[in-house]
Each structure stands twice: as structure tokens, then as C-alpha cells.
UniProtKB/Swiss-Prot annotation:
Top EC class, one word: oxidoreductase
InterPro entries the record matches: 6-PGluconate_DH-like_C_sf, 6PGD_dom2, NAD(P)-bd_dom_sf, Opine/Lysopine_DH, Opine_DH
Name of the protein in question: Octopine dehydrogenase
Biological classification of the source: Eukaryota, Metazoa, Spiralia, Lophotrochozoa, Mollusca
Organism whose genome encodes this protein: Mizuhopecten yessoensis
Record: residues binding L-arginine: 206
Length: 400
């Protein structure tokens, strides 16, 4: 039986996944890209040729994977109808358009995958798919599986590196779907090895969407407005106060997880780790001094040379607050977590402090006196936006 897979998107991740998945036996790949004329451009660029994925292996060798998607289209009816798996490889702000496009055509037995999903993926999917949402299964990945770059649009993409392990959460629907883990493993290959998280809220809480805003706040929170000579180091340039803020925000995440388990027995969020433990687990090979969080971040070799987003101004450079570190991580991250914290009845003053500072920098109003009543809440993915106002509604997807 042919496995029908729809890959949504036209960027680096969509190119990579389309090429890898289409190379597997018994897999039919349809690409759906809603952006402008991207589907037409991709179809024209590929012509009658095959899509090439250049994979840089861990042993230093290169492998070329050649394959061809069955169709590249802007028409959701063509791409979605009959698809066993629908995988979104687009930024979180674009998910809404794809959910709306697939809603009339997605089958009850579909597995809908966010690769990656970002916080609020399940809330948005449930809201837009309506009655169908109870039937479909939803899978959320924490990040993309690879570092990848398009080398020639529509024709060639390079995988610079592949993660060894990647966690996903699963909400099983009432309809029978393909086996989620083994199917995704088949499409990707031997690596990354996929593991299942215990709970979808574990993934939401452990997205640690406060990290980028906290580092920006640590460097620019008391900035005098004068240009600096060069972009400061981002991760490796943090101070102890920023590390302390990261720890405080992480402690609030754990408190929310514990409150949910206490209020709603049967929901296991015991794998929610503090951020220091997370660093030790994920970056143990790259950290040179692991005796505390500050040193774990500042001596992390994978962060070498990464600098703050800046823009050139007279006299030097100034912070670029229009960067995705705030424009995505606040509405698609911190505000979603805040919504869950409100439903759990847990105050999160350190997270609130970062949100209040960041929303002013990007010209938005989400949080007003600690409540999600700002005019821009409707542009976020917090559960309250969709009518999931209680823990029970958040956990079950049933609005009350």
C-alpha cells in the first residue's frame, strides 16, 4: 500500500523532507506551498529532473539522495485529499493558513505533524479543524531534524548536519492512523532517532521560549540608546544576572507542570526538566565547563561566534528588536505558556517581566496588569484565544 505524504512549505525544510521522503519505497510525496507563485516556480525549476538532497554524514562523507515528488501544487484539494500524513515545515505564523486550507479536505485518519510545531500548534489545529480535530492525530516536534540550506531552489538542498535524537509529542485521535513514530522514522531515515514525549504540554513548556527574550533583556534591558561598536556575543556573552533570570523562568515552567499534574491526575509531565539539566543532556559534548548554567551556556562550543541581532546606525550598531527572537518567541511561545499558567492558577512573575518588556519593543500589547487582555492577543496562539480557558479544555480540546 502506498503511503501518501503531503509536505507543506517551500523552504529549506520542505525541500529536504520532500527529497528524503520521496526516495523511500512505497511513499508518494505531494508538496503544498501556498506562498505566492512558489509552487509554479518550483515545478518549473525542477522540470523533468530529480530533486537532489546532499547529506553531510557524521563521518565526514557525503551522500546524494535523488527523488521526485509526485506533485508540487498550490491547490490544497490536490495535495491533501487522501493524504495519510500531512507535515507542516513552515514557520509558526504560516500554520494558520495551512490549517484553513487543509480543513475541507483532510481525512479523519490523517496524522498532522508540526516539524517543528512551536507552542500552541495543537490549540490552533483543534480550533480550525473543528469537529474533525477529534478524529485526526497530531504530532509536534521540538525543532527541525537538520540544519539545511537550499543550494538551488527547487532542485538541490544540502543537509549540513542531522540531530541524533529528536523528541515529539502525540495526541491520538479517535480514527485509526498510520503508526506515528515508525512512519516518521521511515520518511527521515536512520537519524534522528525519534522518541515520544509523555505529554504534549511537556513539549510546550520545554520549548523554553523565554531564552531568547531573556538574553535580549539581559543585554539591552537598561540600554541607554547609544550605538555600540559591534554586535555583542549572544549566548556566550551573557552575564550571571541573565543566567539567574533563565533559571527563575525555568523554575516557573516546572511549577506550572507540577500544578497541572496535581490538578489533573493522569497527565504525566514529570519529564519537564529545569533548563540547566536540559543543557547538560542536549549539549554535553559541546560544554567545556558544566558546573552551573552560566558556564554551561558561555562555554558551549556550538554557540561560538553567534551574536545579537543588530542593525547598522550612525556611530555603530543598535539592537534589532524586530527579529524573530521577539516577534515569534513572544506570541508563538511565551504568551502561549502564559495562557497555560493562567489556567493552572500559577503566577509567573519573571516570565511576565520579560513579556512586558518585549511587547513594548515590538509595539504589541498582549499582557495588561498580568492578564491576557491586550489588543494583540488575537494574533497569538494562547489557548484562551481559541476558547480553551480551563485546564480541562486545554487538555481535552473540548471548549467549555
Amino acid at each position: 500500500m502506498t503511503l501518501k505524504v503531503c509536505v507543506c512549505g517551500g523552504g529549506n525544510g520542505a525541500h529536504t523532507l520532500s527529497g528524503l521522503a520521496a526516495s523511500r519505497d512505497g511513499v508518494e510525496v505531494r508538496v503544498l506551498t501556498l506562498f505566492a507563485d512558489e509552487a509554479e516556480r518550483w515545478t518549473k525549476a525542477l522540470g523533468a529532473d530529480e530533486l537532489t538532497v546532499i547529506v553531510n554524514e557524521k563521518d565526514g562523507t557525503q551522500t546524494e539522495v535523488k527523488s521526485r515528488p509526485k506533485v508540487i501544487t498550490k491547490d490544497p484539494q490536490v495535495a491533501i485529499t487522501g493524504a495519510d500524513v500531512v507535515i507542516l515545515t513552515v514557520p509558526a505564523f504560516a500554520h494558520e493558513g495551512y490549517f484553513q486550507a487543509m480543513a475541507p479536505y483532510v481525512q479523519d485518519s490523517a496524522l498532522i505533524v508540526g516539524l517543528p510545531s512551536q507552542a500552541g500548534f495543537e490549540f490552533q489545529c483543534r480550533d480550525i479543524l473543528g469537529d474533525k480535530a477529534a478524529a485526526v492525530s497530531m504530532m509536534s516536534f521540538e525543532t527541525l531534524p537538520w540544519a539545511c540550506r537550499i543550494k538551488e531552489f527547487g532542485r538541490k538542498v544540502e543537509v549540513l548536519g542531522t540531530k541524533s535524537v529528536l523528541a515529539a509529542s502525540l495526541i491520538k485521535g479517535t480514527a485509526e492512523t498510520v503508526d506515528p513514530l515508525s512512519t516518521l522514522q521511515k520518511l527521515h531515515g536512520a537519524e534522528p532517532v525519534f522518541r515520544l514525549a509523555k505529554h504534549f504540554l511537556e513539549m510546550l513548556i520545554m520549548s523554553y521560549s523565554f531564552v531568547h527574550p531573556a538574553i535580549l533583556y539581559g543585554r539591552w534591558g537598561s540600554w541607554d540608546g547609544n550605538p555600540v561598536s559591534e554586535a555583542p556575543l549572544f549566548y556566550q556573552g551573557i552575564d550571571q544576572a541573565t543566567a539567574d533570570m533563565l533559571t527563575a523562568c525555568s523554575d516557573e515552567c516546572k511549577a506550572v507542570g507540577n500544578a497541572i499534574m496535581a490538578a489533573c491526575p493522569g497527565n504525566d509531565l514529570s519529564d519537564v526538566k529545569d533548563i540547566y539539566q536540559w543543557y547538560l543532556e542536549y549539549y554535553h559534548e559541546d560544554i567545556q565547563d558544566d558546573h552551573d548554567l552560566y558556564h554551561a551556556i558561555t562555554t558551549n562550543k556550538s554557540y561560538k561566534g553567534l551574536v545579537h541581532p543588530v542593525k547598522t546606525v550612525d556611530g555603530g550598531v543598535a539592537p534589532d528588536f524586530g527579529n524573530r527572537y521577539l516577534t515569534e518567541d513572544i506570541p508563538m511561545g511565551m504568551i502561549v505558556f502564559k495562557g497555560v499558567a493562567i489556567a493552572a492558577g500559577v503566577p509567573i512573575p519573571n516570565n511576565d517581566k520579560l513579556i512586558t518588556w518585549a511587547q513594548e519593543k515590538i509595539g504589541k500589547v498582549y499582557l495588561v496588569d498580568g492578564a491576557l487582555t491586550g489588543k494583540d492577543v488575537a494574533t497569538t496562539r494562547c489557548p484562551q484565544r481559541y476558547g480553551f480557558n480551563t485546564l480541562n479544555a486545554i487538555l481535552t480540546g473540548k471548549k467549555e
